[in-house]
Amino acid sequence: PVIEEFGVLLKIPEAAEFVNSLYKLGRAYNLWPIAISQEIGDMAGARGILNNTSTVFIGKVSPFEADQVADILGLKDSARALIKSLGGERGRYREYFVQVTKENAREGDVIQLWPSKMLYWLLTTDPVERSKLGDTLGAYRGNLTEALRSLAGERQGEVRV
């Protein structure tokens, strides 16, 4: 299961217990529950989840937030430096710090995500781009695939917004 903004659930005792049990059972049944948060503070209250997490992805954060994440996760200074170095180029790629724990050993490094143009348009959070996507979606009568193809430049001689 994917749990978006899991910090909200951690504030409800019964929900927090359920989320923690998903992570404990995940190991036993070879499941891979995913908890997503954009708030560093959510991680501080998620010790049970963190203790049963084998893979962590961290996107670009401020230097202060990088220190918070490193402290909460108990990362070495080398990992802290990698998190502070994260970058990317808008519309092309983003960098993420990924840490994998196997048999009580942790390894981490920086990866780059280079999305296709269609995936970029699907996932963009930029308000201007979201508005353009909405306009293009309207021009294609709600056909998301065709709207994305148009924005990605994969359609010739078609409606352009």
Where are these regions (language model features)?
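Conserved P-loop NTPase motor cores
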Residues: P1-L82
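Generic detector of well-ordered alpha-helical segments enriched in charged/polar residues
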Residues: L50, A66-A70, R80-K84, G134, ...
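Glycine-rich loops and low-complexity Gly/Arg-rich segments
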Residues: L25-Y29, I58-S62, A81-L86, L122-V128, ...
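Electropositive, surface-exposed helix/loop patches at the edges of structured domains
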Residues: D67-G87, R92-A105
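Conserved P-loop NTPase motor module
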Residues: E89-V161
